[in-house]
């Protein structure tokens, strides 16, 4: 059982996934700090409040914390844009690698070549 677990953990996909989750969590913290400490104050200058997360709308006993929602939307947009840029870069690199690969002959190509050689030999 322990050996199987070691083999499972040692597989590339599991390790890649773990690294991705850890980096994603760290990146999320960076984006949240960016939004809280830089973007919110800039927006707050125009809105009149520095801390957007405290923006609320009250209707009777109900309190709608739309400032926190705005923060979450900004976080989402930044993270989505960065992920988009990363995927775009990876696709560009992958496409270049595919273009650089020489075409390897297929089984059909070899059979056609053999056929052509046999035809040549028969005509001589």
UniProtKB/Swiss-Prot annotation:
GO CC terms in record: plasma membrane
Main subcellular localisation: membrane
Gene Ontology molecular function: mechanosensitive monoatomic ion channel activity
Membrane topology: Multi-pass membrane protein
Keyword Cell membrane appears in the UniProt entry: yes
Matching InterPro entries: Mechanosensitive_channel_CS, MS_channel, MSC/AndL, MscL_channel
Ranges annotated as spanning the membrane: 14-34, 37-57, 67-87
Top-level taxonomic group: Bacteria
Record keywords, A-Z: Cell membrane, Ion channel, Ion transport, Membrane, Transmembrane, Transmembrane helix, Transport
Classification via Pfam families: MscL (PF01741)
Transmembrane in keyword set: yes
Compartments where found: Cell membrane
Purpose: Channel that opens in response to stretch forces in the membrane lipid bilayer. May participate in the regulation of osmotic pressure changes within the cell.
UniProt subunit comment: Homopentamer.
Annotated PANTHER family: LARGE-CONDUCTANCE MECHANOSENSITIVE CHANNEL, MECHANOSENSITIVE CHANNEL MSCL
Family classification: Belongs to the MscL family.
Protein name as annotated: Large-conductance mechanosensitive channel
């Amino acid at each position: 059982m322990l050996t199987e677990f070691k083999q499972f953990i040692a597989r590339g996909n599991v390790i890649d996934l773990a690294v991705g989750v850890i980096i994603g969590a760290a990146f999320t913290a960076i984006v949240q700090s960016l939004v809280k400490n830089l973007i919110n104050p800039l927006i707050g200058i125009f809105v009149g409040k520095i801390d957007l997360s405290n923006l609320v709308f009250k209707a009777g006993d109900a309190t709608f914390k739309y400032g926190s929602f705005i923060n979450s939307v900004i976080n989402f947009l930044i993270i989505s844009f960065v992920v988009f840029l990363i995927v775009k870069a990876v696709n560009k690199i992958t496409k270049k690698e595919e273009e650089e690969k020489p075409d390897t002959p297929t089984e059909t190509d070899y059979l056609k070549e053999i056929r052509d050689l046999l035809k040549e030999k028969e005509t001589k």
